[in-house]
Amino acid sequence: MAPTGQGGQWQEVLCCSICNRHFNETFLPVSLICGHVICRKCAEKPENQTKPCPHDDWKTTHSPSEYPNNVALLSVIFPRKQCMTLSGAVSEAEKRVDQLSIQIAKFFREADSERGGTVSSREISRTLQRKVLALLCYQWREVDGRLKTLKMCRGISERVMIEIILSIQSNTHVSSQLWSAVRARGCQFLGPAMQDDVLRLILMTLETGECIARKNLVMYVVQTLASDYPQVSKTCVGHVVQLLYRASCFNVLKRDGESSLMQLKEEFRTYESLRREHDSQIVQIAFESGLRIGPDQWSALLYADQSHRSHMQSIIDKLQSKNSYQQGVEELRALAGSQTSMLVPAYRYFLTQVIPCLEFFAGIEHEDTSMRMIGDALHQIRILLKLHCSQDDLRKMPKEERRGVILQAEVPGGMGGGPGGSGGAEAGRIGGLHPLYSQIDETGRSISRTNPKDNSHNSPQTPPKQPRQKRYQMGIPPNRMGYSSDAPPFIPSHQQQPPPQFFNSQHLPQRFRGGRQRGAPPPPPPQPMPMLIGYDMPGAPMMQATEVLTADGQMVNGTPQRVVIMQSPTHLPGGPVVMIPQQQMVPPPQSMTPVGGPMGPMGPMTPSIPVQVPPNTMWTATSPTGSVIYPAASPPGQPPHTIWIQSTDGNMFPMFDRGSGGMVWGPGTMLRESGADAEQLLAKRYEILKRLQPSEDDDDPEDGGIGHVSYTVASSVLDDRMDHHPLTMIPVPTIDLPAIPISFANMPTEETMTMIGEMVQNRPRAPSLTAPSSNQPMNVNASASATVQAECGTMSVMDSICQPISTSAIHNSATIPQPVIPMVQVPVQVPIVPAENFNPNVPPPPPPPQGQPMLVDSAIGLLTPIRPILVAHPQNVVSNSLDKIVDVKERISEAQGNASEAENAHLRMELRMAESQMAHLDPYTKNNCLLRALQQVDMELQQLHLNPTVEG
């Protein structure tokens, strides 16, 4: 292997193994056959001519002073210098090898360390770094060095192939397939901790050479572990014993008429040897099942850590057969040529470029150790690493940017190299992957790799992708059903023309999967969207004409409406919610009827006539007498008709008729991208089904008392948390209340306030607040006062509710005689105000006019049963939460074994935040929204010709 003896760190290759000096123009690096590097001064010393390496013994055929300089390591130290001038290459083949080595060394950079002389790379994995450094440190002047170089090239290509396969397959699916294959052979893995305890108990029982029957061994292990693992059973422990039996760890002694005895073999009577054989058997089962699993994932699966990667890598290397490499190449070729695979075209084209490089090393002959073969092998390694790094950068991108790059990837026939033919055919192979790697300089490095903006004139710009939680599944907007996206969203009424037929093929623009025309400029960034929530209002006038309402409540056509803007406390991160009263709709005129006719069999669809809108309006909402379009797919759980609303930026959003509930319109109606793969849909379906299953917490109908009416009333009256209560404005009719009694018109005396305070402190707590009445006395304990007393002695109303509350009379104290003071009804429309001194000279404020909006507390968990609108659009909340949960879990699966503990903790925190978004929804609403989302997911899976019940 490469410099393992240099200070105990294989990365420290920029200093001499003998004198520890850092390489420079004076102390030039010289590679040895074993892979260690010394300086030119030490190589020329007489005592080092016979044994130049202090760590390894090997025979030399040339004097170390005749070895050429390692210009690849010099290029890492001096990246801006022409290091080829320091090369000692003589022939053209040797110069070619040096040039290719310099280009491969560009993947590394000098890093800071305690000793110095360390290199690192941000582009290739740690395992590849070790192999590539070993390749750069071999001495190709010797025959043994050239043989090691060819073997290392084969190892690098094999590692790249494994990483490509691991990047294609899903870690979750691979692990499930692995354990299914293990169970199919009568074996079982119980988890890292439990499996470890079972193996240690088996070893403790049999390490002295005892012969025990299998059933007795299983029963002993079960009884011992029953206290720590209640789920342990004879079946699962017997499967673990079967796994060891399959690995030939026992000597079986058969007896006539009785059960056989098992004796542990001598070579497996230590835990390390037994565990290694146990792990080898599981890896062998994976190989037999055709599964490719990396050492980092093996360490995570079997040990739940990353400290056993070397242990698992040694097992993998030992069990790999000579045909494993060729089998992997055949798998990639079959995947690239399959028409039924779910690979995007850009990735399929990437595989077609990688497979020839892998096939080169599949048929390489190690007997040919000429310099020409070394040059060809390094040339293929350089191409393979660049292709792999480019695709690896694509995988490390955020998912939205990655999809944008994949969608912008050009057709393979139109891909070429850099300008002026720089790089030749090889530049075309590397630059043809996607636009970020479209130019290769004279050193073979991608120009756009470090600064993608420099190549913006040659590659199309990547459009800003919408985040995953913005892709909803609530309908199909018209611009995804064949409508022209370049038409103006609104036109004046005097310029309205008959709707053209956009379903003619010659009028349809060519589109990518994302729905945007090729070469079109990227859409503007999304803005917060308002939402319309309808509610019942008696006595609504007949709407005779099309009415348009803006977000600020201004009237466009018709009569003005009472529009109130409400910021939903749960809508993430949407815009304001707009509520309009339900209207009695007049049947639309004949001219406004859709071309397709009334509801019936779906026929060719035509766009509706746009609505007249002033230029200063941002969002408009129209009644059903305006634009009515019957889409091909209705949202789940909604009537089949939809009223589409178009914004000034061309986006279309549907408004659903909820019958007596008015009209509902929100941003949660955009269609999921058509490129959503089946794996994400299945993952989302699994999340929905998991949340629809009844849990143990559902047994308590009162939810710990939170859903009880007493909690609702008490929380609304007694809760004084004012820092996080969002306010909603709901217009309701004003309630006339009786006048305040004369006795309360004057300021109470100090003696009266003192007696009231003592009475409040001495009275006991009321037993219940469920059904207070005016004739029932209410006793309150001094530990939790029922009123909030200010310094001046007046009470400050901390909250208000939508209906008057009949309060109880305060009972007389047992020690201080005091007449009963009746409590008046608190008016509904008392705003939240701070405590201040009462001034009897100031008249009370006049009552608000009829229909004026009032302030209502809509904090989460308070007054839930009597809130007409607690969540503006619960379907959006559920869709946002599900999409984010699936996205975060997929990122956690991708980061398994590769990310740091801090990144994993951050992902787990994101998952908890995503799962908490639905916590404030009541169970009935949440289940309804989940059922609608499940129906939509099943419909999309059916469109992909997948059976949800089978795939799920």
Swiss-Prot record:
Pfam families: ROQ_II, Roquin_1_2-like_ROQ. Its EC number is 2.3.2.27. Keywords: Coiled coil, Metal-binding, Stress response, Transferase, Ubl conjugation pathway, Zinc, Zinc-finger. A zinc finger (RING-type) spans 16-57. GO terms for cellular component: cytoplasmic stress granule. The lineage of its organism: Eukaryota, Metazoa, Ecdysozoa, Nematoda, Chromadorea. Changing R255A: Increases ets-4 mRNA levels compared to the wild-type. GO terms for biological process: determination of adult lifespan; nuclear-transcribed mRNA catabolic process, deadenylation-dependent decay; proteasome-mediated ubiquitin-dependent protein catabolic process; protein polyubiquitination; response to heat; ubiquitin-dependent protein catabolic process. Pathway: Protein degradation; proteasomal ubiquitin-dependent pathway. Residues 80-113, 882-922 form a coiled coil. This is Regulation of longevity by E3 ubiquitin-protein ligase.
